[in-house]
């Protein structure tokens, strides 16, 4: 006896409205919309469509801006749930039928998920495991005068400049971290510990 799929989609009022809007979308254009959203799903910081593209979608699907956003958000939510639960295509179709999505739209979801689902799940895994990658390291020394007029000693500070690559933005972000002598020494010791553990695994 087959185990029923966990309920991942519920018929809330907003879901019901979104389903009625999705059911009315031109079936010929719908698969391309799904493909685009699924391709960009793992890029949280990046919208699936530009403002200009959204205006074209409004005209193509005869939707108000608010309704278009509800449709796009609902499609993204359905696909995110599919990724999170790593559902099989047949289970996804069952879920979509439960929320009364028309058969042609449900089949478009299932076909898109069948061809791109596992690739998308893998992209999410990579994003969770390695959201940022260290690309560059720079450093400099700063000498700060003590605030007390009686204290003439300067306090040296090391400044590390880390260039990290974020997959969401595809751009290099510079992070500045300032260390006192003690903080840098503690940081060095932690790096030594990490290096020793890495060496023991290789």
UniProtKB/Swiss-Prot annotation:
It holds the Pfam family COMM_HN. Residues 133-202 form the COMM domain. One of its GO terms (cellular component) is cytoplasm. The modification N-acetylalanine is found at residue 2. The gene is COMMD10. It is found in: Cytoplasm; Nucleus. It comes from Homo sapiens (Human). The keyword Transcription regulation applies. The keyword Phosphoprotein applies. Disulfide bonds: none annotated. Signal peptide: none annotated. Scaffold protein in the commander complex that is essential for endosomal recycling of transmembrane cargos; the commander complex is composed of the CCC subcomplex and the retriever subcomplex. May modulate activity of cullin-RING E3 ubiquitin ligase (CRL) complexes. May down-regulate activation of NF-kappa-B. CDD domains: Commd10. InterPro entries: COMM, COMMD10. This is COMM domain-containing protein 10. Keywords: Acetylation, Cytoplasm, Nucleus, Phosphoprotein, Transcription, Transcription regulation, Ubl conjugation pathway. The modification Phosphoserine is found at residue 155.
């Amino acid at each position: 006896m087959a185990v029923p799929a966990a309920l991942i989609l519920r018929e809330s009022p907003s879901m019901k409205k979104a389903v009625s809007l999705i059911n009315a979308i031109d079936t010929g254009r719908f698969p391309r919309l799904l493909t685009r959203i699924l391709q960009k799903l793992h890029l949280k910081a990046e919208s699936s469509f530009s403002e200009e593209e959204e205006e074209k979608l409004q005209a193509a699907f005869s939707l108000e801006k608010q309704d278009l956003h509800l449709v796009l958000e609902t499609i993204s939510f359905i696909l995110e749930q599919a990724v999170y639960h790593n559902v099989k295509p047949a289970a996804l179709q069952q879920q979509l039928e439960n929320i009364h999505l028309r058969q042609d739209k449900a089949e478009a979801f299932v076909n898109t998920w069948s061809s791109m689902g596992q690739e998308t799940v893998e992209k999410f895994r990579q994003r969770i495991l390695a959201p940022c990658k260290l690309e560059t390291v720079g450093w400099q020394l700063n000498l700060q005068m003590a605030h007390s007029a009686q204290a003439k000693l300067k306090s040296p500070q090391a400044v590390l400049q880390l260039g990290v690559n974020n997959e969401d933005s595809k751009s290099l972000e510079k992070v500045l971290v300032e260390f006192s002598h003690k903080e840098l020494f503690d940081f060095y010791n932690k790096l030594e510990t990490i290096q020793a553990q890495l060496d023991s695994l290789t």
